[in-house]
């Protein structure tokens, strides 16, 4: 029995392109669809567009996580193995599945529906959390290479996308600890400014361009704007400033040079634009444990102070900028999430 994407029994989270109500496009990490159902049959219809790396969907079925390899390009029907439970056999149980985007815009995947057994039922889910956070970040916020747990505190191993998992990003872990929904506007390699960072080489695209978009990777076509009325977070985390040292670490070389002054001005402008969309939200500015020069954090602190907005804060982790030369692995992301969620819980937030 086909369950179409527009079914009211399904729950979604994330910035999703709903141009076609029965073909929603997942772009950002942590974007998800959830379903509760009966029976022991589960398949998912998808359409994938690949830019780079191998692409996988995350799947958590009855608390057990797996990953599903997506076709490089085109439609696919993915079968998910369901273990019948004693409760299910007795006729009063159910299964719950969460499908989610593990990776950033290295691909875009269209969700085309579920398939369950004939005569089976899709059940109501509990209400979504009333707490809502939003994250603007880079590969660390996306959970890139997070599953390479043999490389804690070390440079990355060779990889082709298989270790990237947004579930284990500090961003989603923080949302879990807070009991909050999340929109994770994160892209590997992205910096603040166009023309810097690593994303979309050699015509680098920065967060100053991508922050208000659904589609922003030119590989997939023209950019499209996000409708900010669709989601109003009470907390926004801005985690930009670690890819900005490429191709030149001008902040480290000369804190007061014209490039550095320009960066601080534009960082402040981004915060003002976010504030314009969310007048009542708390905005928490961070970098991460990934090694970087402290001058970037000094700049963020300076901007936050100059804005004189009580609800814009700069938070610094215990091992900020000195934790690891590689991407954050699961234990390091957990460390960040523990510190960040504890800090957020102490703010006077009207959830």
Please report, for each region that a protein language model flagged, where it lies by residue:
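Structural recognition of the beta-strand scaffold that forms the well-ordered cores
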Residues: 132-136, 141, 182-186, 234-239, ...
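Conserved SGNH/GDSL esterase-like catalytic core that processes O-acyl groups on lipids
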Residues: 30, 156-256, 290-297, 331
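Surface-exposed acidic, glycine-flexible loop patches that form ligand/cofactor-binding
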Residues: 124-126, 223-232, 272-277, 349-351
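Extracellular serine-dependent O-acyl
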Residues: 282-351
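A structural motif corresponding to the C-terminal end of an alpha-helix
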Residues: 170-181, 270-282, 306-309
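Generic structural signal for well-ordered alpha-helices
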Residues: 267-271, 300-301
């Amino acid at each position: 029995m086909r369950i179409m994407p527009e079914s009211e029994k399904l729950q979604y989270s994330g910035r999703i392109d709903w141009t076609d109500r029965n073909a929603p496009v997942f772009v950002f990490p942590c974007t998800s669809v959830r379903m509760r159902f009966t029976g022991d049959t589960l398949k998912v219809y998808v359409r994938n567009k690949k830019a780079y790396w191998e692409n996988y969907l995350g799947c958590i079925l009855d608390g057990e996580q797996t990953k599903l390899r997506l076709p490089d390009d085109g439609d696919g029907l993915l079968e998910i193995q369901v273990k019948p439970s004693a409760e299910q056999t007795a006729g009063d149980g159910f299964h719950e599945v969460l499908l989610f985007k593990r990776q950033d815009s290295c691909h875009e995947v269209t969700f085309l529906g579920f398939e369950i057994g004939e005569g089976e039922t899709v059940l109501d889910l509990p209400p979504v959390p009333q707490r809502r956070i939003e994250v603007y970040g880079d590969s660390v916020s996306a959970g890139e290479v997070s599953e390479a747990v043999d490389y804690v505190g070390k440079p990355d191993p060779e990889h082709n996308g298989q270790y990237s998992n947004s579930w284990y990003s500090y961003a989603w872990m923080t949302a879990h600890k807070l009991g909050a929904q999340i929109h994770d506007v994160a892209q590997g390699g992205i910096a603040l400014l166009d023309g810097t960072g690593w994303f979309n080489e050699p015509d680098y695209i920065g967060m100053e361009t991508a922050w208000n978009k659904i589609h922003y990777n030119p590989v997939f076509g023209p950019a499209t704007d996000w409708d900010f009325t669709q989601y109003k977070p009470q907390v926004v985390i801005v985690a930009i400033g670690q890819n900005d040292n490429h191709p030149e670490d001008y902040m480290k070389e000369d804190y007061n040079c014209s490039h550095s002054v320009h960066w601080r001005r534009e960082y402040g402008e981004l915060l003002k634009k976010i504030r314009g969309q969310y007048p009542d939200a708390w905005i928490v500015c961070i970098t991460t444990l990934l090694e970087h020069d402290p001058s970037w954090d000094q700049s963020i602190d300076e901007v936050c102070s100059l804005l004189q907005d009580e609800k814009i804060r700069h938070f610094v982790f215990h091992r900020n900028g000195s934790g690891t030369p590689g991407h954050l692995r699961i234990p390091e992301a957990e460390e960040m999430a523990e510190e960040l969620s504890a800090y957020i819980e102490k703010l006077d937030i009207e959830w």
